[in-house]
């Protein structure tokens, strides 16, 4: 009786969620993997705690008035003024939080924030922070993009026609500014037009929600401008051509990482709207080039917010490494490509960034983030970019990367549910026949080396459940009700059968200690376990005399011994004693997960990930990555007090 009630409730939740979302009748392409419905996924365990902390401590606790005031006053002028982006970044994350865990409080904040923003519109419909004479300059169009993204996010939650009308008016302003015969969008704002051009994404979303062809025509016009000469670029931006040619990202028209990927997010949406292959081929090619040239073991690497051929430079001192805005946007681009292609490599990349670079940037209090994250040194809280608003770009972008997690953790493919993430969770899905299917994932992945999925549905039904087999898991043990199923790393294991309530899927992962060698061959190594990078932390492993070399077995894996007391000591998720040979004798060095290494966010709390071999233990933390290389500020910045 209890389960029947749960199944009915699941259907009602899914129906209600779909009813609230406007139908998109103008999409030419259907996603190969569709995100779970709003509210259908609940993540538990450590990851769920982090998501909940972010919602409570940051997204629901913001002073909305601070975000709205710059729109009311319209005083921004120059290139150092980007308050125009803050409301939209915060609001898009809030809307995802409201979809994930809807409450009266979140709905009330969402409604008020949208209402008050729309009320700031100029007579022509412009929602921004500048007077007419300063529009299209600096970061203005970039900010208009974020306002439009936020307004459309509210419309997707409510279906309110007044909200859509405000979005249309904002779109019309953009057409008046950059449409045919108007200013070339390549000449607008900063970085050779990259930030302004990223308005492509909400313009396509506006077309999909209105069916009004003028917005699609405008989107095509924006892309066409990329191939026309501009005042700053004789050959134009050439984003699509350079991506398809495999050009390294650092050699594009402007190497600004975050803004570049934002343009390609827009191309993903344009592919959905048109079905034109090049609009997908280009983002796929860019992502592959980023994988080849810019990724680090903890995620998406940058220096000073730009691409710099970072893969081969990650083991040394990097000036202002791995901006959190870049990490979040790289995750969002991978999420788009996962939806459109169904290729599990994008889910692998989402997991890598989630458990390492992204969570590593989040402060333990949950309301603040690092601006830059290195692979050694200290954790430095982001500085406040604009004191009147009291925040920074990265503090607001971190939640955007985190809040997409429920949408890609469980998805729906052509033949049934798809499981991408094995953190403890419950997902209320739908079978191909429309029946409610509840998937419960138990265990403590990735601390545990296994997870169990329990299937619940009212009537037995034949369909497929697909499970991501991570590329890093060389030996994966998959069983259905005790029966072994062969799998291959880096693919989906599609299990087609008649499913019934109580069926159990058990999956064991290869959590041996992997030794990764420095990409540039400089002799350094890093230790990984599953999707998690491990780091030394000076609260667990003290500097002392000795020369250490990691000990490996005949298969070149390191021996890891779980050390829960060490993890508890520094409030880390996990800790392991790793066997090294120190001055010819076996000893252990204690590592913790990278995301919690340095989590005191203090100048005294030093960590290190890449390790020279042999490692001089006396100088293990003398790495040269000072806090000054991890901050835009000229003084140490603490997490602001509430």
What are these language model-derived features?
Residues 6-14:
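Bacterial N-terminal signal peptides
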Residues 21-104, 108, 137-157, 196-214, ...:
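Aromatic (Trp/Tyr) and acidic
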Residues 90, 104-140, 165, 294-302:
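Helix-terminus loop motifs that line ligand-binding clefts
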Residues 132-141, 148, 164-194, 200:
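Asp-box/WD-like beta-propeller blade repeats and closely related beta-sheet repeat scaffolds
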Residues 178-183, 188-239, 243-251, 256:
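Solenoidal tandem-repeat scaffolds enriched in leucines and small polar residues
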Residues 219, 283, 348-356, 361-451, ...:
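C-terminal beta-rich recognition modules with glycine/proline-rich loops and embedded aromatic residues
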Residues 475-482:
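Short, surface-exposed beta-strand/strand-loop-strand elements in extracellular ectodomains
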Residues 483-489:
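Short beta-strand segments within Ig-like beta-sandwich modules, predominantly Fibronectin type-III
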């Amino acid at each position: 009786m209890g389960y029947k009630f749960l199944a009915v409730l699941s259907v009602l939740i899914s129906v209600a969620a779909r009813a609230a979302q406007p139908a998109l009748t103008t999409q030419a392409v259907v996603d190969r993997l569709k995100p779970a419905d709003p509210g259908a996924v609940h993540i538990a365990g450590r990851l769920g705690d982090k998501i909940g902390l972010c919602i409570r401590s940051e997204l629901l606790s913001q002073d909305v008035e601070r975000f709205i005031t710059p729109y009311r006053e319209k005083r921004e002028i120059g290139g150092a003024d980007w308050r125009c982006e803050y409301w939209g970044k915060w609001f898009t994350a809030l809307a995802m939080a409201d979809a994930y865990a809807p409450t009266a409080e979140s709905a009330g904040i969402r409604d008020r924030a949208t209402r008050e923003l729309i009320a700031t519109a100029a007579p022509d419909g412009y929602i921004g922070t500048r007077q007419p004479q300063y529009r299209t300059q600096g970061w203005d169009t970039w900010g208009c993009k974020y306002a439009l993204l936020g307004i459309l996010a509210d419309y997707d939650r409510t279906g309110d026609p007044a909200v859509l009308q405000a979005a249309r008016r904002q779109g019309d302003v953009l057409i008046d500014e950059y449409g045919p015969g108007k200013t070339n969008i390549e000449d607008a704002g900063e970085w050779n037009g990259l930030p302004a051009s990223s308005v492509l994404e909400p313009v396509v979303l506006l077309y999909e929600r209105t069916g009004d062809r003028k917005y699609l025509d405008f989107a095509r016009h924006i892309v066409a401008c990329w191939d026309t000469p501009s005042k700053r670029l004789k050959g134009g931006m050439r984003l699509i051509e350079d991506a398809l040619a495999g050009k390294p990202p650092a050699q594009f028209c402007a190497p600004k990482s975050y803004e570049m990927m934002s343009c390609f997010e827009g191309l993903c949406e344009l592919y959905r709207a048109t079905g034109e292959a090049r609009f997908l081929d280009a983002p796929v090619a860019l992502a592959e080039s980023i994988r080849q040239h810019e990724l680090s073991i903890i995620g998406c690497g940058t220096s000073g917010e730009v691409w710099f051929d970072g893969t081969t430079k990650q083991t040394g001192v990097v000036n202002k490494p791995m901006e959190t805005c870049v990490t979040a946007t790289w995750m969002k681009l991978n999420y788009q490509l996962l939806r459109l292609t169904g290729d599990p490599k994008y889910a692998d990349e989402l997991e890598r960034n989630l458990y390492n670079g992204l969570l590593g940037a989040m402060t333990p209090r949950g309301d603040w983030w690092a601006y830059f994250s290195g692979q050694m040194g200290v954790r430095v809280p982001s500085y406040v970019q604009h004191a009147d608003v009291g925040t920074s770009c990265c503090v607001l972008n971190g939640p955007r990367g985190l809040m997409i997690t429920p949408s890609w953790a469980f998805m729906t493919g052509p033949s049934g549910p798809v499981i991408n993430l094995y953190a403890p969770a419950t997902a209320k899905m739908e079978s191909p026949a429309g029946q409610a299917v509840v998937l419960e994932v138990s265990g403590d992945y990735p601390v545990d080396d296994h997870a169990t999925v329990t299937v619940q549905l009212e009537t037995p039904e034949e369909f497929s459940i697909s499970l991501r087999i991570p590329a890093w898991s060389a030996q994966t043990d998959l069983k259905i009700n005790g029966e072994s199923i062969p799998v291959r790393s880096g693919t989906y294991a599609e299990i087609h059968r008649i499913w019934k309530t109580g069926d159990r899927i058990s999956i064991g992962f290869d959590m041996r200690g992997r030794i990764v060698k420095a990409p540039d061959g400089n002799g350094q190594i890093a230790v990984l376990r599953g999707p998690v990078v491990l780091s030394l932390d000076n609260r667990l492993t003290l500097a002392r005399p000795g020369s250490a070399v990691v000990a490996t077995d005949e298969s070149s894996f390191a021996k890891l011994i779980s050390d829960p007391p060490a993890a508890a000591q520094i409030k880390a998720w996990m800790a392991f004693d790793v066997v090294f040979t120190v001055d010819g004798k076996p000893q252990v060095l204690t590592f913790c997960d990278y995301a919690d290494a340095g989590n005191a966010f203090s100048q005294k709390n030093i960590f290190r990930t890449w390790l020279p071999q042999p490692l001089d233990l006396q100088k293990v933390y003398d790495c040269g990555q000072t806090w000054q290389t991890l901050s835009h500020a000229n003084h140490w910045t603490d997490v602001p007090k509430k």
